[in-house]
From Swiss-Prot:
This is Ribosomal RNA large subunit methyltransferase M. It is an enzyme of class 2 (transferase). The active site is at K308. Its main location: cytoplasm. It comes from Stenotrophomonas maltophilia (strain K279a). Catalyzes the 2'-O-methylation at nucleotide C2498 in 23S rRNA. HAMAP family: 23SrRNA_methyltr_M. GO terms for molecular function: S-adenosylmethionine-dependent methyltransferase activity. S-adenosyl-L-methionine binds at S191, A224, P225, G226, G227, D243, D263, D279. It is found in: Cytoplasm. SUPFAM superfamilies: S-adenosyl-L-methionine-dependent methyltransferases.
Amino acid sequence: MAPVTDTGIGLLCLCRQGFEPELAGELQFRAGEAGFAGYARTQRNDGYVLFMCDEAAALAPRLRWRELIFARQKLVVLAELPQLDPADRITPMLDVLADAPRFGDLWVEHPDSDAGKPLSGLARAFGNALRPALRKAGKLTDKPNNRLPRLHVVFVDGTHAFVCVADPADSAPWALGIPRLKLLPEAPSRSALKLDEALLTLLMPEEREALAKPGMRAADLGAAPGGWTWVLTRQHMHVLSIDNGPLRQHVLDTGLVEHLRADGFHWHPEQPLDWMVCDMVEQPRRVAERMATWFREGWCRHAIFNLKLPMKKRWDETRLCLDLFQDQAGKPLVVRAKQLYHDREEITVLASPLR
């Protein structure tokens, strides 16, 4: 599609509350790698980072949403409106958009933070008021159209909003960047949502169809009580579940699971597997090294694993662990990592051979 905009004062990225420094560090690093100057504006616990850059529209496609680890959503900021009149918030936004092209959709949002969550009612009501005003001005299609840029209004308080634009092909397809997943009653643990979200977020739809096929063979390292194993069985995979602890009986009853009582950190298969998944609580560098060994030895073709991050210097540790993994894997791999909504102080990594 055509560029979402020729202008922009910066990038607005949403994140998990408390991880603003990590996202700021990542944006600064990746923008520098791409040859763009800029600086991050943020405060801890805001749930967002504003990366100021005079060339934001050109920078945005260089920082692909799927490649950003700590960003739940990535938007190009058209304008910041810090002193809105509660009696008329619409007119300043229409003024800002006077020369803008038509948009295919409108999302009115807020950060997922202590200060942002109370704004959900305002966001919903304001969206209902702004949509007809935009359509009357010829700025919004009657029905959602993903071939056109998407307009975002992000409130950070009742009188302070960012007017932004996103490329639907290079941004999260969910409001606030949060996929709405439901924990089914039969899920052995809430960790099942992490793997569900990883498959949804880290793989494109066509990749999921090609790489997660029924009948594939997988290993789940540190499997108990069976949350990730259960997700794999729902993909109709045959799973070796490695853990000295017990699995839930209904997971075993699927007929697709073999439970091996062993230390998941040291076990390896006799024959190569299609998939390996791992959500073990261990130092991230040790996990990165062990995951690299799996690829170097040819024990799996694809993997999804979690890296538990330390309390300090989490962006530095993330870079170190991912570099360590790729250096030691012994083969070229596509590596994608995200701090998922259902992650906590951790990131989830996908590794797969280059196609």
